[in-house]
Amino acid sequence: LVVPPGTPAGVYNITYKLCEKLNPLNCDTAIAKVTVDPSPIIASPDVFSNIVAGTTPNPVGNALTNDKVNGQPATLGTNGNATIGPITPATPIGGGPVPTLDPLTGGVTVPPSTPAGAYTITYTLCEKLNPSNCASTQITVNVNAPTIVAGNDTMPATNGATGGTPVVNALSNDSINSLPAVTTGATPNTTLVVKTLATALQVGKPVPSLSAAGVVTVLAGTPAGNYTIVYTLCDAVNPTNCKDATV
């Protein structure tokens, strides 16, 4: 008895007749019962760590890398040996986007602006030849908050009598995820909040101010002297990811 490759799992009955060679009419009939088992499936958990969401989709790996069907690497597509069945998507954090699993390729992707945190995707890996032969496992994606650099600034001197705006912006040496910090416009990646106002050198006189766009303004009539403003620069996606700096 031979079981060809690609035979679906199940019970097969083969009826055959055995006859005596010397007396060909002396025969008996029997049934050979063949049980074909489904292939063993190994769907192993996956963990992708130290991932940072960027401004474009970030492919972090493939869920099938450590999965096997009948001892062979699990593969998808026309000539593959497996399919990805039902997927339970990750739970959003703060209503933001979540990592995704592509059922056609097994690729795991972290979309732009995905909040920092741990995400779990559950998926089912099934044998292509026997679609009901499946195993489930989980993918864990640990997304880190991007690094914020908030550099201290020393503004060029401004005439306090007439006032004005220094040509240097407080955000000029600040960055998030190695990209320039932007607090305004259609796609800001950070927020700027003044933490400590400048202290007046004379009672009732104006002091320099700092806007949410990083612009320092010196009002006319500001007494000469050195002023310090402390501000906090925060990640627009992860509001608790912040750094302080001074102007």
Give the location of each predicted region.
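Extracellular/luminal low-complexity segments enriched in Ser/Thr/Pro
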Residues: 1-9, 107-116, 215-224
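Glycine-centered loop/turn motifs
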Residues: 10, 53-55, 117, 160, ...
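N-terminal regions of proteins, emphasizing targeting and processing segments when present
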Residues: 91, 112, 147, 198, ...
